[in-house]
């Protein structure tokens, strides 16, 4: 029986990748999902300096919308000037071209109609593609930022920085990461609620075509673990979906390598009762409140 982990790509597009992960455990599949969601670095607007804002949009709402605009994060892990450093690792005081990208937005409505401001109207100071707003196609204007009426104006400067979604969701390269296992429910991990017929009232997913259906009355093992997972990753556009998975696997490997190294270097020491100064008949009050008195250990 093959014990090596395999990845079979079923479908890949500009914004999503659908694949099958086999010969692995539920823990590994979920770890990969969590890494892809929160550990892959991207660039996003982190600071907004508003000079003028006479629109109906409050400053904090405007800053929040700007922060959630997906920005091109290709090659962000490369050394500057191709990529970016984390601000916390940079030698500068606050931000600099090595750890940030500047974007500007200046707009004023002079006509009688409504002027719509989109992500495409953001001007990036750098010559590289890093930090540019993601557009679905050349004709697209990107997400709507705000609307201006006559004589209303906004003028601001944005500082985009490198980060991960563990710090804030705006740095997440994905909009959704999901996986399914055992589409026929052979392991009986799911109890279906139904009125008459469970098969008729619970349609099978497309993943059921990749497995043999169970025979009627087929026995099952409660302790059996799933070994095949159907994963679907949807990108926000800042990083291609195939690159998201490559980076996710690399980051997961690095985390496991650090864990193994630390376990090898530091062996846990077992302390005796004497070393802990714990006497067998020591009087301890384990009540968390001590009748209103201060705890003393």
From Swiss-Prot:
InterPro entries named among the record's database cross-references: DNA-dir_RNA_pol_30-40kDasu_CS, DNA-dir_RNA_pol_insert, DNA-dir_RNA_pol_RpoA/D/Rpb3, RBP11-like, RNAP_Rpo3/Rpb3/RPAC1, RNApol_insert_sf, Rpo3/RPB3_RNA_Pol_subunit
GO cellular component term, pick one: chromatin
Effect of residue 24 to S: In strain: Isolate TS54
Region described as Disordered: spans on this chain: 270-297
Compartments, record wording: Nucleus
One of the protein's GO biological processes: transcription by RNA polymerase II
Matches recorded under SUPFAM superfamilies: Insert subdomain of RNA polymerase alpha subunit, RBP11-like subunits of RNA polymerase
PROSITE patterns assigned to the protein according to its UniProt record, in alphabetical order: RNA_POL_D_30KD
Listed Polar residues bias regions: 287-297
Outcome when changing residue 7 to L: In strain: Isolate TS99
Superkingdom, taxonomy of origin: Eukaryota
Gene Ontology MF terms: DNA binding; DNA-directed RNA polymerase activity; protein dimerization activity
Keyword tags: DNA-directed RNA polymerase, Nucleus, Transcription
Signal peptide: none
CDD domains registered for this protein in UniProt: RNAP_II_RPB3
PANTHER family for this protein: DNA-DIRECTED RNA POLYMERASE, DNA-DIRECTED RNA POLYMERASE II SUBUNIT RPB3
Family: Belongs to the archaeal Rpo3/eukaryotic RPB3 RNA polymerase subunit family.
HAMAP family: RNApol_arch_Rpo3
Entry function: DNA-dependent RNA polymerase catalyzes the transcription of DNA into RNA using the four ribonucleoside triphosphates as substrates. Component of RNA polymerase II which synthesizes mRNA precursors and many functional non-coding RNAs. Pol II is the central component of the basal RNA polymerase II transcription machinery. It is composed of mobile elements that move relative to each other. RPB3 is part of the core element with the central large cleft and the clamp element that moves to open and close the cleft.
Record text on subunit structure and interactions: Component of the RNA polymerase II (Pol II) complex consisting of 12 subunits.
Full protein name: DNA-directed RNA polymerase II subunit RPB3
Annotated organism of origin: Schizosaccharomyces pombe (strain 972 / ATCC 24843) (Fission yeast)
